[in-house]
């Protein structure tokens, strides 16, 4: 909680992790979620879904089993009350208007990370987007 309240913190980033198995358990800790929600710092997530599928892991399978559509709109809806911005892949541009109409800003990029250069580029773009939302 101390790190979350650090005045030097410029915002919050949710990595493209499984929202159901990785992110939600952290956010289920009331003090963590409340502190993030009460902060005036921007909150951005990177979609774990690209083109209707998860890159790795069971995210898409879990979404299907829950009766959810496997797309970035479902991710936006899941994080709707939490995030200010969502970074989606170029292949999912068709969802920009729907996501933005829900009040979430969208940045479109190549979010598939095949190597360290891709990871660095996406991290830099994510920080830039976070700063734009400040």
Residue map of PLM features:
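Short, flexible loop segments at boundaries between secondary-structure elements
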Residues: 39-56, 111-113
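Short acidic, glycine-rich surface-loop motifs adjacent to enzyme active sites
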Residues: 8-22
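Short, conserved loop/helix-junction motifs that constitute active-site signature segments
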Residues: 34-40, 80
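Short glycine-rich anion-binding loops that position phosphate/pyrophosphate groups of nucleotides
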Residues: 17-21, 49-51, 92
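A short, well-structured juxtamembrane/interface segment
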Residues: 1-6
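Charged helix-capping and loop-helix junction motifs
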Residues: 25-34
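Structural motif
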Residues: 10-13, 42, 85
């Amino acid at each position: 909680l101390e790190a979350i309240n650090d005045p030097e913190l410029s915002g919050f980033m949710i990595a493209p992790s499984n929202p159901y198995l990785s992110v939600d358990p952290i956010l289920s800790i009331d003090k963590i979620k409340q502190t993030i929600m009460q902060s005036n710092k921007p909150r951005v997530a990177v979609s774990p879904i690209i083109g209707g599928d998860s890159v790795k892991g069971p995210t898409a399978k879990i979404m299907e089993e829950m009766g959810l559509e496997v797309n970035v709109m479902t991710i936006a809806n899941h994080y709707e009350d939490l995030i200010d911005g969502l970074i989606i892949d170029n292949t999912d541009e068709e969802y920009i208007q729907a996501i933005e109409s829900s009040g979430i800003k969208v940045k479109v990029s190549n979010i598939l990370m095949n190597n360290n250069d891709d990871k660095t580029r996406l991290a830099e773009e994510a920080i830039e987007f976070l700063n734009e939302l400040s």
